Amino acid sequence: LDRSIPQGKFTHLGIGLGISRHQLTLFMVFIGRHIHIDPVERLIRSAKETELSARLVNPQARLEGIWWYYEPYPEPLSLQRLRVGDVPPYWSDTKSWLRPQLPLGSYYASDGSRGEVELKSQGFKVKLPFSHGPGLYTGVVYLSTGGGSYPAGLISFVVRD
């Protein structure tokens, strides 16, 4: 598989054909299936947190962490902000890095915590915080197999009042 699909990080290949009167178009989509996320409710009402669990497809892969992003619902911009061109960025600066839990007695030097993601024999589980209130939350799971980390899965949640 590593030789047949580019970069070795893709596990599936989708092939499509587009046909018109004077043209034939071939397109390919490379997809990597690296984690199986267990079913979870993705439309949340006023929750403080929800538990996410997943299994790793490749037993040699290692969880590096999860980037956890928050984006508030868009609000109408005032005429003054529109004139100045003060448009908010797509991703706000509200993100956090959820790290694998360390063994008892070990702590991360940066903040003194043990980490947030519980490692299991074939995967992981984590309590995802919705601490910023209503909005869109996205988790990007990063794995490594010895050659650097890569995004292996993504899941988004909608939180409403």
Task: Label each region the model flagged.
Residues 81-82:
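Signal-transducing coiled-coil/dimerization helices and immediately adjacent hinge/linker segments
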Residues 35-41:
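Proline-enriched interdomain boundary motifs that mark the N-terminal boundary
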Residues 145-161:
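Short beta-strand elements
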Residues 44-49:
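Solvent-exposed, conformationally flexible loop/turn segments
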Residues 37, 76, 147-149:
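Short, surface-exposed beta-strand/loop "edge" segments at domain boundaries and coil↔beta transitions
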Residues 50-60:
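Aromatic/hydrophobic beta-strand junction motif of beta-rich domains
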Residues 1-34, 58-77, 86-142:
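A well-ordered secondary-structure block
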Residues 52-54, 135, 139, 150:
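Conserved glycine-centered beta-strand/turn positions repeated across beta-sheet architectures
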